[in-house]
Amino acid sequence: MSKQQPLERLAAADVITSLRSELEQTHSNPADVEREMRTRIEALHWEIFNQTQAEVTKRWTYEQGIKRPYYHVTELDEEQLTNWGKYLDSEEAEGDYERTKFLYERCLVTAANYDEIWFRYARWLASQNGKHEEVRNVYQRASCIYIPIAKPAIRLYYANFEESQGRFDVAVAIHEAILMHIPSHLETIRSLVNLHRRQYGVDAAIDILRKFTEDANCTPQTRGALVAEWARILWRSRDDSTGARKLFESTQNQFLDSQPFWSSWLLFEIDQPSNQSEESTAHERIKAVHQLIRHKSTLAPELVKILSSQYTRYLEERGGKDAMSELLKLDAELNGPASIQNAVKA
């Protein structure tokens, strides 16, 4: 049927012009020129067909796995999410930016409620040169439309992105928006504190910590963890281990049931650098904190055992000549029969 069609309907004008110009240099008969042009155009269409068929075949397995190509609030099953992941892997391996981006957008029609897809899309775009606005657009769509604020991880990454672009005020505003809805979200508060530390200095970070440790909207567990973070910044950023220790000591009565507080205090003392001559003093400090955990804190027995295991590890790895005696006595008190444990409590 194509043999009966005019050449102008078989190929684009620029293709016809190029072929005609080439063939007229080697063929003097117009009929020969047209016959050869038709042969080459047919070969061109056959090549396009084969390429298209090959591309379709590569993707057909993944396309068959797409059972729900539209948006719905109900969850996708794990099989479909896995299929989308493999499909994206395959398309990324091809290296075609436009095709890969188009597939991500198709995937989001179905899986817009899954922050892992938005994370993947943003990270892939960030790996492309000069795509900062596209990355920002992805984070904004995820944060403002699809992912509920009760799942703040994507918003925190959005804040990190804006900070990396020098928009510190926007990054701060994103954190504050999260905390308006989730006042005690520890990860967000820590992220905000470290943002201030990086951009405005240690004093600014401590001001944020002080604000939230005094905030009645924060739970005791969160405030205990923030005091531990405060001590960590004093030690790590100011090299003020004495100030950090005083902070722990002065606030201990407020956080008797805060596992992050006691765990951080114990690890703080264990991690203090000391030489052989100072190890005895360090041991006494570590032992004192451990005794507070066992006899003063109101932590659950299971948590006390976990923290005690850190102390026994310290005794084993850094303890002195009498460390094994103390370790075995402590092990019996913590893990021995009820008669021993009850005697210790009495």
Where are these regions (language model features)?
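Polyampholytic low-complexity alpha-helical segments
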Residues: 1-346
